[in-house]
Regions:
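Conserved SAM/SAH-binding beta-strand->alpha-helix loop
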Residues: 97-99
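SAM-dependent methyltransferase
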Residues: 167-242
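N-terminal auxiliary segments of SAM/dcSAM-dependent transferases
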Residues: 1-23
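A short acidic, Gly/Pro-enriched loop at the edge of an enzyme's catalytic core
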Residues: 126-133
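A short glycine-rich, Lys/Arg-flanked "PGG" loop and its adjoining helix->strand segment in the class I
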Residues: 150-162
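Conserved SAM-binding strand-loop segment of SAM-dependent methyltransferases
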Residues: 111-123
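Conserved alpha-helix/loop element of class I SAM-dependent methyltransferases that forms part
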Residues: 48-66
Length: 277
């Protein structure tokens, strides 16, 4: 317990990783899949009606031609892949969660959709002049550190054909992330563990960096404790333009979200469509 207190008493260094991977944990990934598929909540994926509106906007704004090849980075259970494939586009989805991909493959087979799903880390993308468009939805871009974002943008640029577009969304610099802490206990099957466990959660903010961290310490009945971290970089328009330009992109569209809501300086989220130069 003393060691755990000492670990949690310190503020983590920016983008310091957690003590275990979150997305590949077998139990957590199954619970995450359930959250993705819950139509009543935006906890992991957006609600079906929102996804439908986003896909409408993306098809128009990305100027996708019939049969265009599209890459979905961090595709999860394939909700966007399925919606786009049903419209006649050729989809490839990449995700690190085996549970989500197993569901996505089964759903595609049952629907007769020829989606290609790849099990892997999208940060290791290695394709060349392949896609007309790429997607990275639900703020995944801001989870990555500065070097990882820069490297990923270069890889996406390389994977796109000349003039190809990249659409993604992020949390805005206008969003407020106050520091807080809370705890919860479960005697049975919970999100983090299948047996009894305690969860100590806190949000740490670094306002000078427009960065925050959600930290979860999961304590099992044996006393074993594991700390998980999810980082969230917040972005201004200027920062986005700078990072995109460094990787060979031009910012074409900036909205408040992927349904095309007009952007204002008070918007808490930003959606971007950038074109490969």
């Amino acid at each position: 317990v003393k060691q755990l207190i000492e670990r949690l008493a310190q503020r983590p260094e920016p983008f310091a990783p957690g003590e275990a991977p979150l997305w590949t944990d077998p139990h957590v990934s199954r619970r995450m899949l359930a959250a993705h598929l819950d139509p009543s909540t935006d906890a992991a994926s957006r609600r079906p009606e929102t996804i439908a509106r986003e896909v409408d906007w993306l098809v128009r704004t990305l100027e996708l031609r019939p049969g265009a090849p599209v890459l979905d980075l961090g595709c999860g259970p394939g909700l966007y892949c399925a919606a786009l494939a049903a419209r006649g586009f050729v989809l490839t989805g990449i995700d690190i969660s085996g549970s989500s991909l197993a569901y996505a493959r089964q759903a595609a087979a049952e629907a007769g959709l020829g989606v290609t799903y790849v099990h892997g880390d999208y940060r290791e993308l290695d394709e060349h002049d392949t896609y007309d468009a790429a997607l990275l939805v639900y703020h995944d871009f801001g989870v990555l550190s500065d070097p990882d974002r820069a490297a990923l943008l270069l890889r996406i640029n390389e994977a796109l054909r000349a003039g190809g577009r990249f659409a993604f969304d992020v949390v805005s610099a206008a969003a407020d992330r106050p520091e807080r802490s809370e705890w919860s206990a479960s005697i049975g099957d919970g999100f983090w563990r299948s047996g009894p466990h305690l969860v100590l959660e806190r949000q740490v903010d670094y306002p000078e960096l427009a960065l925050s961290c959600r930290e979860h310490a999961v304590v099992e009945e044996t006393g074993t404790a594991t700390v998980y971290r999810i980082w969230e970089q917040r972005f201004s328009r200027e920062r986005l333009e700078r990072e995109l330009a460094a990787a060979g992109f031009v910012l074409e569209h900036l909205t408040a979200d992927l349904t095309g809501t007009p952007w204002t300086s008070a918007a808490e989220t930003l959606a971007v469509v950038a074109r490969r130069r």
